[in-house]
Each structure stands twice: as C-alpha cells, then as structure tokens.
Amino acid sequence: MNRLLICQNITKHYQEGSLQTQVLKEVSFSMQEGELIAIVGSSGSGKSTLLHMLGGLDQPTSGEVFIHGQSLQRATQDELAKLRNQYLGFVYQFHHLMADFTALENVMMPMLISHKNKTEAKDRAENILSAVGLAKRILHKPSALSGGERQRVAIARSLVNNPKLVLADEPTGNLDHKTTESIFELIQKLNQEQKIAFLLVTHDLQLAEKLGRRLVMQDGILRESNS
C-alpha cells in the first residue's frame, strides 16, 4: 500500500509583537491510501492548525508535507492549487454551502470551477448525492435541509472531484448525537466502498474510537493513541 501523505517535523509558530506562540511541535506521521484516521484532542491543542498545513492552506514555520510524493512547501501557488484539486477534499464544521444554490448546484461547483463539462458535473454530483443518501433532496436549497442533510451535501461536495484524501475539520461539531453518528457511519461507508482516505479532526472520543486509527494531539504534540 502506498503512502498518500507524509508529514515531516511540522512546527508552527505565530508571532504577535514580541510574543511567540508555538502551536505545533515537530509533528510527524504518514497515511496510507484508503486509510481512515481520527485526530482527537481538546480545543486549542493544534488539531485544526495541523489540518491547514496538511491541506496547503497555511505554511509551517519548518518541516514539510508531501501529498502523493509531492512537496507542498516546494510547490508554486499554481502547483499547490492543482495538487489540492487533484488529491484533496475539504469538509468543515460549518458547511459553507451557497444559500441561493440547490444541493445539486453546490456539489457541482468544484467541478465547474475546474472547467469540467457541465453535463459531466451534473451527472457526477447526482451520483455522489445519491451515495450520501440525498437522491430525493438534490433540488432543495440549504435552508430547506436539516443540519445533517446540509453536512451530507458538504461531504458530497468534497468528493465530487474524486479526491484521494478528504480532510474533515470537526464535521459533526454542530450536530446532535444521532446525526453525528449517521455522519460517522457515512464516512466509514465511503471509506470502505470507494477507498477514499479520510483524516478526521474531532473532539468526540467516543466516536473516534470506532475508527481504525487514532492520533492524539496535546499541546501541539501528536502521538499514536494506545487505547
């Protein structure tokens, strides 16, 4: 099995005047294709900051991230954008759906931005929405969907460009327990059936225990869970 992601000695400092805050401390780990990993830790431990580094949304103070063997730190902005479009999908705690667009149109958008054919984008979006259980809700706007349905649309949108890896930052943070469980089950299903790798940041230890591999972030230090 090939290594999809390699994180080497990632350190991140933030400077405010004379005050320097170290958020990540020489974080290193790797991830295989099709793997499902949860990163758990308390609020402020550095989980979301790490996810931003892994997605090329922010740069580390030192260290390097490789996606499919390509360094994010050595890439130009155009190369970085191409890497993200080709290999990565993103899901956040807040769904960030466009209110005036239907679920179908929201999911089509990343493909249209990538200059894909509109018919191809529509067919792909319909298939993905069906896969996440929303075949009968594709023409509804976000305001007509429940919280769980909106997050399913966000997950579908992250999958529409057929990524190798989805980075999910607290994707169930605003949902009730029952809906949270259904979203976790969906992620597991997509991982098993479509072999999509997921790196999931969460503070929900109970649900994280159901996933294959758990990493614990504490005070900017990442370690394997022994439990």
From Swiss-Prot:
Protein's name in the database: Lipoprotein-releasing system ATP-binding protein LolD
Binding site for ATP: 41-48
Gene Ontology BP annotations: lipoprotein localization to outer membrane; protein localization to outer membrane
A UniProt-annotated Pfam family: ABC_tran
Enzyme class: translocase
Function of the protein: Part of the ABC transporter complex LolCDE involved in the translocation of mature outer membrane-directed lipoproteins, from the inner membrane to the periplasmic chaperone, LolA. Responsible for the formation of the LolA-lipoprotein complex in an ATP-dependent manner.
Any one of the GO CC terms: plasma membrane
InterPro entries assigned: AAA+_ATPase (IPR003593), ABC_transporter-like_ATP-bd (IPR003439), ABC_transporter-like_CS (IPR017871), ABC_transpr_LolD-like (IPR015854), LolD_lipo_ATP-bd (IPR011924), MacB-like_ATP-bd (IPR017911), P-loop_NTPase (IPR027417)
Family: Belongs to the ABC transporter superfamily. Lipoprotein translocase (TC 3.A.1.125) family.
Compartmental location: Cell inner membrane
Keywords recorded for this protein, A-Z: ATP-binding, Cell inner membrane, Cell membrane, Membrane, Nucleotide-binding, Translocase, Transport
Domain ABC transporter, first and last residues per copy: 5-227
Subunit record text: The complex is composed of two ATP-binding proteins (LolD) and two transmembrane proteins (LolC and LolE).
One MF annotation (Gene Ontology) recorded for this entry: transmembrane transporter activity
Xref: Gene3D superfamilies: P-loop containing nucleotide triphosphate hydrolases
Membrane topology per record: Peripheral membrane protein
Enzyme Commission number: 7.6.2.-
